[in-house]
């Protein structure tokens, strides 16, 4: 039985009855929710315990906006981390029992072990010469180093500039720009040419094909009235980014047409130059790259796209099934070229490309509805765009391979205008 003195001493303690807060063992002393046990010196829930373990030793919050007098919301929600940490400390939570650096992984030890490992790694050809293991060949000596093959294409740039300035070779009058481009495509393909089978592809053949491709694109674009209204600088810049996309699509379209008409065999690729209709077996042609690299094709196999031939075959088969008309093919060329140029140059070029694509899309709609009497054409356009997507994806993959080859200094080829040959 308690004595009166002990009872009176208890009532006269420093804490008044109004300031005493009694907590149940089942209630978190911080937020008032259901507790999980005693953590770091106080009865708390798991959320408050985790918060204190995470923030108890850091205390790197933004300062409280209410001078540490925030009101706590119901259901355990806190809007202010400093005030929540202060309440944790007020109820007796302490960092004395925190355990630091108990993980078996130590960054300092790992760094020392890594340095020791590198010191013990023996020199290989790759580490000694500074070249990748992807090319299994030692670096040549200074006497064996071959100077870069410099190719001046200024004459070609001047020819392309003159073509753009002079305009179309044949004046045409058509209902809209898309049909004019289709007629321009027929004019560029022109007369029948002598067939020629290419069995070897070297420097002269490669540069000749590039030159013919760029000239064809420049002549074809002169039949695009909206394009001709741009400044000469803008036309020249866009041509540099469009010619490879156009030539890739034109080559596959000609190959599909040649196979359908049985002009070439089913495993051949066909295109045309100014004077000849050329054909080649991709897997049988002899390729000479000694003029641009000191490595052989076998050594450069990693930098080649091994699946390119198979993907080209899929595109050719799709074109043989769809048999696009010249109007559809012209739209495909414009869409692929403008989309790529806009994505490459951005800014003003992107705005121009989007405006041209919208105009040509309206012309294609008129062509289907009024000329072809085909109001339900969405599925056909979708199949045509699948072909364009395949070609654009191949070009982007080729760009990655080209950049990788440039990093490893695989080719000793240098152009006077390198921006023209980024997408080879």
Curated annotation (Swiss-Prot):
> Which stretches of sequence are listed as region Disordered?
1-20
Matches recorded under SMART domains: HOLI, ZnF_C4
Locate the DNA-binding region by residue range: 25-100
Q: Which PROSITE patterns match?
A: NR_LBD (PS51843), NUCLEAR_REC_DBD_1 (PS00031), NUCLEAR_REC_DBD_2 (PS51030)
* ZnF bounds (NR C4-type): 28-55, 64-88
Task: Give the source's domain of life in one word.
Answer: Eukaryota
Give UniProt keywords alphabetically.
DNA-binding, Metal-binding, Nucleus, Receptor, Transcription, Transcription regulation, Zinc, Zinc-finger
Q: Which GO terms describe its cellular component?
A: nucleus
Which stretches are annotated as coiled coil? none
Q: Which Pfam families match?
A: Hormone_recep, zf-C4
Q: Where is the NR LBD domain?
A: 169-424
Q: What does this protein do?
A: Orphan nuclear receptor.
Q: What is this protein's name?
A: Nuclear hormone receptor family member nhr-55
Instruction: List the source organism.
Output: Caenorhabditis elegans
Q: Which gene encodes it?
A: nhr-55
């Amino acid at each position: 039985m308690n004595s009166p003195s002990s009872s009176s001493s208890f009532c006269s303690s420093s804490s008044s009855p109004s300031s005493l807060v009694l907590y149940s063992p089942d209630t978190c002393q911080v937020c008032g929710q259901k507790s999980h046990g005693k953590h770091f010196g106080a009865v708390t829930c798991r959320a408050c315990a985790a918060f204190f373990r995470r923030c108890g030793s850091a205390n790197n919050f933004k300062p409280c906006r209410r001078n540490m007098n925030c009101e706590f919301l119901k259901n355990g929600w806190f809007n202010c981390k400093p005030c929540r940490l202060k309440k944790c400390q007020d109820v007796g939570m302490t960092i004395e029992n925190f355990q630091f650096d108990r993980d078996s992984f130590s960054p300092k030890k790992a760094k020392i072990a890594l340095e020791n490992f590198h010191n013990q790694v023996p020199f290989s050809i790759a580490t000694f010469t500074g070249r990748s293991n992807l090319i299994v060949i030692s670096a040549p000596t200074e006497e064996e180093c071959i100077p870069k093959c410099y190719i001046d294409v200024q004459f070609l740039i001047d020819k392309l500039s003159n073509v753009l300035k002079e305009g179309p070779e044949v004046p045409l009058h058509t209902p809209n720009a898309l049909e004019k481009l289709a007629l321009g495509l027929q004019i560029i393909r022109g007369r029948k040419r002598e067939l020629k089978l290419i069995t070897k592809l070297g420097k002269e053949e490669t540069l000749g094909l590039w030159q013919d491709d760029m000239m064809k694109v420049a002549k074809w674009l002169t039949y695009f009235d909206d394009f001709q209204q741009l400044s000469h600088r803008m036309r020249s810049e866009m041509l540099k980014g469009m010619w490879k996309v156009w030539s890739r699509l034109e080559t596959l379209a000609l190959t599909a047409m040649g196979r359908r008409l049985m002009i070439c065999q089913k495993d051949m690729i066909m295109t045309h130059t100014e004077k000849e209709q050329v054909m080649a077996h991709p897997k049988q042609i002899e390729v000479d790259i000694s003029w641009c690299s000191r490595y052989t094709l076998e050594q450069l196999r990693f930098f080649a796209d091994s699946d390119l031939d198979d993907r080209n075959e899929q595109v050719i088969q799709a074109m043989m099934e769809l048999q696009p008309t010249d109007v559809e093919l012209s739209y495909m060329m414009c869409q692929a070229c403008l989309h790529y140029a806009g994505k490459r140059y951005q800014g003003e070029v992107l705005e121009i490309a989007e405006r041209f694509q919208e105009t040509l899309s309206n012309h294609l709609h008129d062509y289907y509805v009024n000329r072809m009497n085909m109001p339900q054409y969405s599925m056909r356009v979708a199949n045509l765009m699948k072909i364009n997507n395949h070609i654009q994806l191949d070009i982007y993959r080729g760009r990655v391979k080209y950049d990788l080859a440039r990093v490893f200094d695989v080719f000793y080829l240098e152009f006077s205008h390198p921006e023209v040959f980024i997408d080879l």
